[in-house]
Amino acid sequence: MFSSITASQILINLNGNSIDNLSGLINFDNTIYKTIEKTYKLSSFNLDLDQSNLVKNIKLNSSIANIELTGKYNLSTLPDAFMQYLNEYFPTFVKTKTRYIYNDKADLNVKIKNFSIVNELFVKDLMVSPSSLVNCSFDASINYLNIKTTSDVISYAGVKFKNNDILVNSLTNGIKLIYNATAINLSDSLAFRNPTLVFTANDKISDFDLNWDNKLSPKNAGVISG
């Protein structure tokens, strides 16, 4: 498929000799992405990297999303640090490549502004409403992960999830996920109202509680545990 990217202004000003100390600015203004079917206006794209100090900060501002990564980390070791975290809770399924103990610590914040371009170009089954938020804190040295997400509407393969809140937290007995919403619409006529899911996993052991209640008459409610 033919495609092209054009920008009226391109600014690249970077210093450093590795991905872990690269600092500076990358800016694209009035960016246009063209395919045979459609032209997409991406507006501005600004990537600001400050990795010259112990506490690093990377900011991405675009018409699609704003993303910020802050903390004491190395981009080259963050993936291995996360695998180390997963190995602590799921040693049967996740193996580490080394005995080295990573100490990467980072906070990630994401705000969705316009997901439609990503939806049309890359993930046609997934749509996320504007102002959706993801806030994540990670500390490999103490095997800690906390994730909070909020979104008015998430659509996947025709199923709509409304007023979503997700919390993921590290516990001594595993990783716990709590999901709350006002509705999961499977179709125009079928919906689960006020669903709540609590899921805990630790290696081969897991348990969950799923319940919903439409709080209307006729009543549609249920509880599933396992």
Enumerate the language-model features and the residues they cover.
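Surface-exposed, low-complexity/disordered segments
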Residues: 99-100
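Short structural boundary motif marking the start of a folded domain
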Residues: 104-106
